Amino acid sequence: MWVSSMWWPVLFLCAAFGAVFGNEVTLPVSVKFGDGLLSFSKNTNGLFYTINEQDGLTVENSISTGESNVARNNQEYTLTECSTNEEACVEFIINDVNVILKKDLSNRASSVSHVVVNSSTDGVRIGACVELGDGVDWFGGPEAKYQLWPVQDAQWNYTAYYTKEDDAVAIAEPYWLSSQGTYLYVNPATSMFIDQNYLNEGSLCIYAENVTPYRERNYTSLEYWIGRYEDPRTAHEAAVEEFFAKPTDVPDERMIAQPVWSTWARYKIYVNDTIVRQYAQEILDNGFNHSQLEIDDFWETCYGSLTFNTSDEKFPDIKGLTDDLHDLGFRVTLWVHPFINVDCTEYYSIAESAGYFAKDVNGTILTTWWQGENASVIDFTNEAAVEWFTSRLTALQASAGIDSFKFDAGEASWAPEPAVLTGNVEESPSIYTYQFARALATFGNGIEVRTGWQTQDLAIFVRMLDKDTSWTFENGLPTLITTLLVMNLAGYGFVLPDMVGGNGYIDGVLVSTQYPSKELFIRWLQANTFMPSIQYSFVPWDYDNETVEICRTYTELHEAYAPTIIEAMNALVANGTPVNPPVWWLDPTNSEAYNISDEYLLGEVILVAPVVVEGAVTRDIFLPNGTWRDATYGTYDIYEGPTWIYDYPAPLEVLPYFVESSYWETLSAGSGAFLPSSSLTAIYTSAILALLIQLFN
Ligand SMILES: *[C@@H]1O[C@H](CO)[C@@H](O)[C@H](O)[C@H]1NC(C)=O
Ligand SMILES: *[C@@H]1O[C@H](CO)[C@@H](O)[C@H](O)[C@H]1NC(C)=O
Ligand SMILES: *[C@@H]1O[C@H](CO)[C@@H](O)[C@H](O)[C@H]1NC(C)=O
Ligand SMILES: *[C@@H]1O[C@H](CO)[C@@H](O)[C@H](O)[C@H]1NC(C)=O
Ligand SMILES: *[C@@H]1O[C@H](CO)[C@@H](O)[C@H](O)[C@H]1NC(C)=O
Ligand SMILES: *[C@@H]1O[C@H](CO)[C@@H](O)[C@H](O)[C@H]1NC(C)=O
Ligand SMILES: *[C@@H]1O[C@H](CO)[C@@H](O)[C@H](O)[C@H]1NC(C)=O
Ligand SMILES: *[C@@H]1O[C@H](CO)[C@@H](O)[C@H](O)[C@H]1NC(C)=O
Ligand SMILES: *[C@@H]1O[C@H](CO)[C@@H](O)[C@H](O)[C@H]1NC(C)=O
Ligand SMILES: *[C@@H]1O[C@H](CO)[C@@H](O)[C@H](O)[C@H]1NC(C)=O
Ligand SMILES: *[C@@H]1O[C@H](CO)[C@@H](O)[C@H](O)[C@H]1NC(C)=O
């Protein structure tokens, strides 16, 4: 194990290419910058400057222009000192590339460097690379299909950093954090690309370049902050305070406590009145609770009509159906997407002639989505379009008895590119997502979206992008945890996990279905138990009675801990702290905690260690600093963390979890309502037996 407290990322910023560095420029060798050193070098790829920061937390000198280091014969170069008491600052211009470096000296416990590089030269690409470093773990970055945790081994091949369908980047906040307590935050209004482990192996590089999907601007700008703190938790708290909006409230509490039931994975597009009624009845007959029943794809006459198909084979009397479901105690929600297919002629032509579709620079409005080869997408940055869209939804709610909505898509990439959107050009195209989520959040805190960009303030659930029915890091069960952690680090703590067992797609074909195995289904639910909500589509009773019993148990356990989930959500509202943090959150200086990707916390009081490996019936568990009560088997044994428990027995029916000791005492002193009910005992009998066998072997 190699950890260096002296480690600090090296930045090289290369303003490369063409006109800028075509001329020979004589460079200064180095300039003192705060407590670090700024040095320049040049090679055939362009100009580089490097900031080498020493461990100088106590240094508070203002910037020296380092006159003695400046090559005076450089005509195209000027250096100015712009310091105040709070900031060390240096500005220099090389040809027309204007570089401003600022260093925050006001906070003695930290060191924040602020870098702005501006150029109005055409075709310029400005980059900054952070060396990921041996033995350093990195967290954050985008939501991704192949979701790792930590993320330093991820590969990104010079890719535009905005909300997009490709690689499942539905959340793209420009924020990374290292186990050394360093954060990198980039101005979201950047024509940003990232490259990791591709052009520069071992580095995370950010770039600004004015090419599609970004709109043309007459300058290129890269602005970022590097914050350095004693550990990742302190760094994250500082970053949240500085850059993230906190949610204004918590989402719908019934959606937290009781499962959402979606028709999607089980029925795909073959939904109708009969099927919905049958589904509802099965849920009740099997003794499960529900927050809502969601009617998913395909209920419309055509995609984008927002009109129920009232044929006999579909929904002949939707109001009658929702009335009956309401009588049974269900709320009814509806899948809605922002597209209109070209063959949905009546509605398409209204939106087209009114200019409601997102268009590219040439006025093209055609796009493609998973249920429409020829379609267009509503422009959510156009107020009139939003008004038209939302008023149709409101009318539909009234006429069809719909309580709330599941809003799909919403990533900026669905618009033809480069899209011409209303609003700040610098924020285009992700401003699409920003306005999408904001417009739809007006339907209340019982909605769900699946994308976010600078929308952490909204009191709504954000769903993980569709998960696949698999055991692998390629979008399978292990990524239920890693995606949870990444979303939380990006400030989105109201995570709606995708459906239990995944979507059951066969080879990515949306309308075919392959059930998850019993084992995968149960392990998936267990992993989901202490996440903010449970969403079913495949059902336990399609397996066997044991599955039903186990699933009922963990669904109940989730509900029993709903008050704890809400407490953690209130902490996010108040302080910006993650609802489901990684285990290092409670042990931020312990290097053993950093790379644990198969455990998570609920608030700071529950530690969850699900089995996510096929066939496994034991696992190793890391407990971070603190006193923990083993709640798994109801024995409440005490463990002092940090410690490892090796080969902890966890047969199929068992989810290992631990309760922080003082919280456990609070619960025990109370009504005990939070503690697992006695119905768990039966489930655990065989597990306890397994434990005994294990102990006596
Ligand atoms: C960079 O350029 C943009 C556009 O001209 C300007 O708005 C911004 O203030 C500049 N930043 C700095 C630090 O000069
Ligand atoms: C990145 O490039 C490498 C090498 O060309 C390739 O193997 C890999 O599939 C690419 N990854 C992505 C996500 O495009
Ligand atoms: C960019 O172009 C706009 C419009 O032509 C102009 O107002 C603005 O000053 C320009 N900005 C820069 C940094 O050149
Ligand atoms: C409604 O659904 C039925 C059955 O799938 C289909 O045949 C019919 O074309 C649809 N009706 C409309 C108006 O789209
Ligand atoms: C509803 O859909 C199911 C499955 O596709 C089908 O078997 C059934 O006939 C449909 N119900 C009606 C009333 O058409
Ligand atoms: C827009 O039209 C011009 C001229 O035909 C063409 O060169 C350009 O590629 C088009 N841009 C897009 C995004 O289609
Ligand atoms: C989409 O449009 C193209 C070009 O007009 C056409 O060839 C194709 O058949 C259309 N696809 C569908 C599903 O209608
Ligand atoms: C569950 O057990 C009941 C009897 O208690 C039996 O009727 C039913 O068929 C069983 N269901 C399954 C799915 O095994
Ligand atoms: C259903 O909800 C009730 C009341 O909140 C709760 O006591 C019960 O445990 C829940 N049952 C299941 C199977 O989740
Ligand atoms: C996690 O880090 C430890 C060192 O702290 C190392 O021994 C272990 O192999 C790492 N595990 C993984 C899965 O990378
Ligand atoms: C461990 O946690 C306790 C409080 O539970 C705290 O006082 C102590 O400083 C922590 N130790 C480390 C190494 O973080």
Residue ranges, per PLM feature:
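Residues at secondary-structure transition points
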Residues: 13-14, 147, 676-678
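Beta-strand-rich N-terminal accessory domains
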Residues: 21-111, 119
